[in-house]
């Protein structure tokens, strides 16, 4: 069994958390998530979340802490164990969200209470 490591970030602006929606037709298309992605070889998870956040949202962030970790077996039945870490983030400079249309088609800012109604993966919900 192989291991896959993921890193995501929770950014709060004006009391609301940034969520992005996966593009229809992609894996989990239409689902909302926190920005982030796969840890590349030689990269630390905290570096991954900063890189992925910039790629997916156009925002420059820094890590301020860890919100949680979760591991699970691959949902598609591949012999793989997934390990996800969610980090707390702040913006280096406030900016406008610019999505990568290849991956995401919408974004929104929700309070923790508003986000409770979203269909979120457990590792995202636990990190709110």
Predicted regions and their residues:
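Structural detector for helix-capping/boundary residues
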Residues: 15, 37, 51-52, 64, ...
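Active-site-adjacent beta-strand/loop module that shapes the phosphate/pyrophosphate-binding cleft
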Residues: 61, 70-96, 108, 112-113
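Short secondary-structure boundary/capping segments
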Residues: 1, 9-10, 24, 77-79, ...
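Short secondary-structure junctions
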Residues: 56-63
């Amino acid at each position: 069994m192989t291991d896959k490591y993921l890193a995501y970030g929770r950014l709060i602006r004006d009391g609301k958390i940034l969520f992005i929606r996966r593009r229809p037709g992609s894996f989990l298309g239409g689902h909302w998530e926190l920005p982030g992605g796969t840890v590349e070889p030689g990269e630390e998870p905290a570096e991954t979340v900063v890189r992925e956040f910039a790629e997916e949202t156009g925002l420059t962030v820094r890590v301020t802490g860890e919100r949680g970790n979760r591991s699970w077996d691959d949902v598609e039945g591949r012999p793989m164990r997934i390990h996800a870490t969610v980090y707390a983030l702040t913006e280096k400079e406030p900016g406008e969200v610019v999505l990568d249309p290849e991956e995401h088609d919408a974004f929104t800012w929700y309070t923790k209470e508003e986000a409770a109604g979203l269909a979120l993966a457990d590792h995202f919900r636990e990190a709110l």
